[in-house]
Amino acid sequence: MTGRRCERTTSPGTGGRLRAEPADFQVQEVPAYLPGGSGEYLYLHVEKTRHTTAHVVRELCAQLGVRDRDVGVAGLKDRHAVTTQWLSLPAKVEPRMGDFSLPGVRILETSRHTNKLGMGHLHGNRFVVRVRGAAGMAEQAGETLATLAQGGVPNYFGPQRFGLGGLNAEEGLRVLRGESELRDPRVRRFLTSSVQSAIFNALVSLRLEREVFDRLLTGDMAKKHDTGGVFLVEDAGAETPRAQRGEVSATGTLFGRKVKPLTADAGALEAEALALFGLSPQVFASRKGDRRLIRVFPAEAEVRPEDDGYVLAFTLPKGSFATSVLREVMKTEVDAPGAGPDTTDEGEAGDGE
C-alpha cells in the first residue's frame, strides 16, 4: 500500500534498470550552510557506500565513545547508493578521528562550526542516476525531464517509505485501528508515518486525475516556491495563474493534531483521499502533522547518453524523492530496497512527525 500514484507525463517511457551497483545511484546533500572553520563542533564531510546514515552514526559512537544524541545530521540517506553528507560531532573527539575506520566510508573533509548540525539543515539533494538497459533513450529521457523541470513533478513519497509491497502502511493502518500488538513507540511512529504518506500520495493522484495538479482550489493552503510563505486560497480563479507559472503550489495535509484539515473545495478533495483508507483525522492525534507541497521542480536537470542507457542528474528540495522523477521518465515502478526506520528514503525523515 503506497497510495495511488498517477503519472503527470504522457510521454513514452525509456524503461531500463536502476542500482545495478551502488555507484549507479549517487546522492549528494546540498547543505543549508557550510562550516565556518571555528567552533566547538567538528563537522565531517562523509562519503558512504552501502551504509545508511544511522549505521555510520552508530559506528562513530561506538568507535569514538560519544552518545547518539551528540551526533548531528541534516538528513537520513539510503543504503543502496553512494551518498555524501555532513555530520557533526563534539570537537573533543577530533584527536581520536584517526582511529575511526569503516569499510565503505571515507572522510572527505573536516572543519569546525559553532552549532550542532540539525535535522533539516539542508536545501536539498543532488541526484546522479545511471539507467542501464535503455540504449538510445537519452533523448526521450531529456524531453520528459525538461517537461518536469518546467511544470513540476508530483511530490510523491517514494516506495522506500512503504517497504516491500507497501507492508509498512498496511501495518500502520492496523496500529491506527488498534489492531496491532506492536509496542515499540519508534516503530509505531514509523509505521503510522507510512499511512500519512500513503494518504498524501492518494491526494496528489486525485489532483492529477481531476486536472487540478497545477491549479489551486478554494480552501487550499498554497506555498510560495521562492520564499516558502504559506497562504489560504480564498479566490482560486485569481491565484491559479500564479500556480500555472510555477510561482506557487498547493500543499497537502500530513494529518496530525497541530495541522487543521483543509476546507471548501480543497477540503472536499482531501476528505475523499482520507476516505479511501477508512480513517478520520482524529486517529492521527499522536502525530504533530505537517503540510507538504504537492509538486516540486527538478533543478539543474541534465541527461547524458551512454552506450547502454543514460545518466540523469537533477536537484530536488529536501524531503523529495528521486523515484518520483525516475518513474515519470522510465514509466516503470521503482523498487523499495530494505525500507525501515533507519533507511527512510533518498529524501529526509521527519515529515509529519
UniProtKB/Swiss-Prot annotation:
HAMAP family: TruD. InterPro entries: PsdUridine_synth_cat_dom_sf, PsdUridine_synth_TruD, PsdUridine_synth_TruD_CS, PsdUridine_synth_TruD_insert, TruD_catalytic, TruD_insert_sf, TruD_pseudoU_synthase. Its EC number is 5.4.99.27. Residues 152-296 form the TRUD domain. GO terms for molecular function: pseudouridine synthase activity; RNA binding; tRNA pseudouridine(13) synthase activity. The keyword Ion transport does not apply. Keywords: Isomerase, tRNA processing. It is an enzyme of class 5 (isomerase). Signal peptide: none annotated. Responsible for synthesis of pseudouridine from uracil-13 in transfer RNAs. It comes from Deinococcus radiodurans (strain ATCC 13939 / DSM 20539 / JCM 16871 / CCUG 27074 / LMG 4051 / NBRC 15346 / NCIMB 9279 / VKM B-1422 / R1). Belongs to the pseudouridine synthase TruD family. It holds the Pfam family TruD. It comes from the Bacteria. Residues 343-353 have a biased composition (Acidic residues). The active site is at D78 (nucleophile). GO terms for cellular component: cytosol. This is tRNA pseudouridine synthase D. Residues 1-21, 332-353 are annotated as: Disordered. The gene is truD. It catalyses: uridine(13) in tRNA = pseudouridine(13) in tRNA. One of its GO terms (biological process) is pseudouridine synthesis.
